[in-house]
Amino acid sequence: MACIVEDPQRAGQSNETQIALISGVPDDISKSCLARVPREYHMAMKCVSRRWRDFVCSDEMCDYRNEFNLAESWIYALCRDISGGVFLHMLNPFSSRRSWKRINDYPYIPMREGMGFAVLGKRLFVLGGCGWLEDATDEIYCYDAAMNTWFDVVPPLSTKRCYFACETLDGKIIAIGGLGLNPNAKRTWDIYDPLTRTCKSCSDVNIVPEMEDSFVMDGRIYIRGGVGGSSTAVYSASSGIWERMDDDMASGWRGPAVVVAGDLYVLDQTFGAKLTMWCKDTRMWIHIGKLSQLVMKQPCRLVSIGNSIFVIGKDCSTVVIDVENVRKNKMNGVMVCSSIPKTWDDDIDVISCKSVAI
């Protein structure tokens, strides 16, 4: 994947490139060896030398690990504390001591709300937003998970917006609807292409107002909004148009949604928390089970890794659901799941969650 942000200039890099990654070993073999090191050790590897650091942080390293199924997905939660400050928490689900950790402070928009959150490759993007004393903005910021660094991204969104849906499709970031200085913003969407560094705006009357939730499945973007989330629409990149969502499918979309192995799961938080699945063959919603309220606090966000759904609630209280085994392991209708407790006393709201594979 091509570089999509401006990296800081590194002094003396030309001299370092003449030094082998591993003494006496060709660089292609050295890169193959380094790419096989588990992700939890990458931070230590960056301390060995500048060349090791540059390779570990590179798109080449990320692409190699993805190509040979070596990539490991970590979860990143965009959070807000009681003071209104915005920051990131990270979870390594493969660690023997699974716990959330706060990472680099978010330096640009400490009090902003209604932001979009998206991931492309090894980079997370925070888009738009507004504040009590700040109008909707078109700014885009990028966090490189390999470099552990924030960057300012250009160009900005075509439309200043907040409280909008944000998804990635075909290698592009799509910001949909929401509110903005332009009253027509709620009927528009922006397509940001990181390869060409261009952002174009499109409009369609079928885009639903007051955006609440969205997901991507089978090459389409689904959005839900309106009063009580009663309006839905679906976008196909091949046609470039928005259409009304199927009524049967829309009827069961009553909470945050996530796609696992091509199947759609929804966490209905109307009365407690219950997990449902959309069956494509019968075109019906199937009740999977309930979640215990003792290990998590609503409202919750969902993110998937492999066959597992991570239900992330207030204060980053987390429940892990294995969708292959959950139907067999239930007690009185309550799903048997593993949990990851919070490790701090602060009051934290989770805005959005994404996984980044490196």
Curated annotation (Swiss-Prot):
Pathway: Protein modification; protein ubiquitination. Residues 20-67 form the F-box domain. The keyword Electron transport does not apply. InterPro entries: F-box-like_dom_sf (IPR036047), F-box_dom (IPR001810), Kelch-typ_b-propeller (IPR015915), Kelch_1 (IPR006652). Kelch repeats lie at residues 78-122, 123-171, 173-219, 220-269, 271-307, 308-355. SMART domains: Kelch (SM00612). It holds the Pfam family F-box. Keywords: Kelch repeat, Repeat, Ubl conjugation pathway. GO terms for biological process: protein ubiquitination; response to cold. Part of a SCF (SKP1-cullin-F-box) protein ligase complex. Interacts with SKP1A/ASK1. This is F-box/kelch-repeat protein SKIP4. It comes from Arabidopsis thaliana.
